[in-house]
Regions:
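Anaerobic metallocofactor- and corrinoid-dependent redox/one-carbon enzyme cores
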Residues: 48-54, 77, 118-127
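Glycine-rich phosphate-binding P-loop
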Residues: 49, 59-84
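Accessory recognition modules or surfaces
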Residues: 49-53, 59, 108-112
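N-terminal pre-Walker A segment at the start of P-loop NTPase domains
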Residues: 13-55
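An accessory alpha-helical subdomain
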Residues: 1-28, 148-180
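A broad, low-specificity signal for short, low-complexity segments enriched in glycine/proline
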Residues: 24-27, 72-79, 96
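N-terminal start-of-chain detector that recognizes signal peptides
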Residues: 34-39, 78, 85-89
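Conserved nucleotide-sensing/catalytic segment adjacent to the nucleotide-binding pocket
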Residues: 1, 83-161
Length: 180
């Protein structure tokens, strides 16, 4: 993820943040907005399951951030969420199931707006006003960095699948033990 993060153009990312902030929060409200923290995606014995599509189905405006690990999705979401709260809006933060400190999606019910992510964990293909963060990098990655990213990605998915397999087996054993 650090390889991707190094390639981001901070000026372009700042433009995304300002654009989103101005489009979502057209007026200020009185006071500081409250927040709620939840998970929309989970690691289960049956694999990775996400409910972001169902949770976002009633929202009129959907922004989609697409990008792999290290593309700054959490930073963007935290900034937009914090800005919304400062302007008085209630923000729902959906956390990443692997690293709960990271944010996967945010929902702003008062404006019927959400920012959801297509990412390496949920592997979803959400539709909406899309920002493909790969388009906001400084320049083409060197071949060695591409090779490192590919290796890391392959290893990540191999370990994820192994972990899910172990959770699945533990679940089966748990069910068997409970039958006694």
């Amino acid at each position: 993820s650090s390889l991707n993060y190094e390639s981001l153009d901070s000026n372009k990312i700042s433009n995304i943040i300002e654009n989103l902030k101005n489009n979502i929060f057209k007026s200020d409200k009185i006071g500081y907005g409250s927040e709620r923290h939840l998970f929309a995606t989970a690691i289960t014995p049956d694999g990775i399951i996400t409910y972001a599509d169902q949770l976002s189905s009633e929202f009129k405006k959907k922004y989609v951030l697409t990008g792999g690990p290290g593309f700054g999705k959490t930073d963007i979401l935290k900034f937009i969420g914090s800005s919304g709260q400062k302007k008085g809006y209630f923000i729902e933060y959906m956390h990443d199931p692997f690293v709960p400190e990271r944010i996967e999606h945010i929902f702003i019910p008062e404006t019927s707006t959400c920012i959801i992510t297509n990412n390496e964990i949920n592997q979803a293909n959400y539709t909406g006003i899309e920002y493909n963060l790969f388009d906001y990098t400084k320049s083409a990655l060197s071949t060695s960095k591409k090779d490192d990213i590919k290796y890391n990605s392959d290893l990540f998915y191999e370990l994820i699948n192994k972990g899910i397999s172990l959770i699945h087996n533990a679940h089966l054993l748990h069910d068997e033990l409970e039958s006694y």
